[in-house]
Amino acid sequence: MLDGVTRQQCYFDNEIQRVAKNTTLTMDALKHVSKTKDKTVDPLVVAAFYKFVQLNDLASLQDKIESCCRENNVFGIVLLAQEGINSTIAGPREGVVKVLDRIRQDSRFSDLQWKESFATKQPFRKLRVRLKKEIVTLGVPGVDPTELVGTYVKPADWNALISEPDVFVIDTRNNYETEIGTFKGAVDPGLDSFSQLPSWLEKKIDAGKQPRVAMFCTGGIRCEKSTAFLKQVGVKEVYHLQGGILKYLEEVPEEESLWEGECFVFDQRVAVGHGLELADYELCRACRFPLSPLDKQSEYFQEGISCSKCHDQTSIEQKAGFAERQKQFELAKSRKEAFKHAK
């Protein structure tokens, strides 16, 4: 759940961070050598980026970005709010580079960096450029990451920080994300939505005692906004992982890593591990929780209908609806396969 609505809206309200490599210059992007395992396939580029910056011309920006994406066959999600931009887009490299160039022509985004990964098929079905109240929904008025945030910690320095006994390490992600992986020793608030975090922090963090707090999330946006909240309520020593879990998994060798498990991502890949290798997870179509091969062996797992997480959360009528949807999905898939083999 996210802000009382279905988790499918995470595509609109959470960061959708994906991935691999910060690129600061267009020429760097153009010269990048693909690491895809299938050399017969020209991979699509997936670019994830965000920036907290004051924006007042949202409608104009929306039109410009949407037009540029459509012109260049780029799909994905772009969220715009007065506090900034949050996006993940995917398409041919040339198209993605043109979109990023167009955005960076705006002086407010001239220093925009992005994280880059690859996909052998388009991970997004549509292009959505949306205007929002917040680019990541915390729901607390007055929190402004453009004015005040915590201290960035590079992935190479993260292990040393979170290993210190007086540092309170907090995973700011939702429970369906933390369930498949987190940092060793981190506290999981058990969130259904990011907007629940402020009330949890108010109960657990006593600003008067001036604790040392380290926060992390998938790609950096949620923990950055979380540190802004803690700084606003008076906590002085607040840190957050620069580039998020994904940058850590990319840069820190597995043998040195304090990460345990996999990292949930908000696209059809579902999860990645060390080195940003694809992990063996898929989503339950009923509840959207990530499922491992072991989860799929559960007696409660029915493809497209239920899993061990949701089997007792839906009615008989809902399950019947899911079953019909699954039937239609399989029928459409078989027709597509039949068409493919007939060509």
Please give the residue ranges for each predicted region.
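N-terminal amphipathic/basic-hydrophobic helices that include classical n-h-c signal peptides
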Residues: M1-T26
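Rhodanese-like catalytic fold shared by cysteine-dependent sulfurtransferases
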Residues: D28-V149, N174-V213, I221-K343
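A conserved helix-loop-strand patch within extracytoplasmic ligand-binding domains
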Residues: T146, G150-K154, L161-I162
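Glycine-rich active-site/cofactor-binding loop and its immediate structural neighborhood
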Residues: P165
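Structural scaffold elements adjacent to functional motifs in cytosolic proteins
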Residues: V169-D171
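Cofactor-cradling patches in redox/metallo enzymes
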Residues: F216
